[in-house]
């Protein structure tokens, strides 16, 4: 047999955001239906001027594919010193029936795509139906990807954006308005942005509370993306006290996600977690039950999202004769 190699530009051509949203919905449902084996992911954090690298491994029983992803970020000196991007991703796909390596693909786009899609899936399930205004705390690549995904499933009338980096905020405003035609209002403070939100999206590498509880108005849906390791934090734990908390994985979010902080401070218990997003999508747990509810989606990211997304890309590549096959096994 031969192994397929897919480069970044090929991956980009092989899947669109609508397909990714479908793949992520499939992933969440599979995870909550005992169709997934997914060990705890591990990360290595380097000293200053370097970043972190995470490894995620997952087996999806329905498609008989095992995926393994390595994804790094925050290596700010990479372009100048090493001639490579500051964020690098690689995904390996194995046929679970033989454990033969069937595909090696660039994974740098997939992490951004499936993470953006996760926010959109939560908006479909948990945001108010009349939600129109988004607040973005953070204006980097993932903040853009969240808008790209949410824009697929609802009409965004305006975005209130805040960043601690003025240059990033300015680029975000220009890029979003040019690509989507959505007005972006530059907020003078985090508080100003949050108070306007029907949907609040946080995508920072924050190490402390960025969003205070009394800024969040009734009916807000919060998409908490940035916290996926101990030490990271974006939300005031008090927000969780009176919110409906939905997570991608109870096991991950209670140990490494935003939900760990209110648990650690005894503001909530594990019993206060409403459920996993897959349970909501399957109809086992209700989604939003009133227009006044504050809902939180805590997303730490799961290997099964990479699995279903990468598998779809692989299928599209085979169907369209894209990529390069090579003889990996003698």
UniProtKB/Swiss-Prot annotation:
Its EC number is 1.-.-.-. One of its GO terms (cellular component) is cytoplasm. Disulfide bonds: none annotated. Keywords: NAD, Oxidoreductase, Plasmid. One of its GO terms (molecular function) is oxidoreductase activity. SUPFAM superfamilies: NAD(P)-binding Rossmann-fold domains (SSF51735). Coiled coil: none annotated. Pfam families: OCD_Mu_crystall. InterPro entries: NAD(P)-bd_dom_sf (IPR036291), ODC_Mu_crystall (IPR003462), ODC_N (IPR023401). It comes from the Bacteria. Belongs to the ornithine cyclodeaminase/mu-crystallin family. This is Putative dehydrogenase RA1029. It comes from Rhizobium meliloti (strain 1021) (Ensifer meliloti).
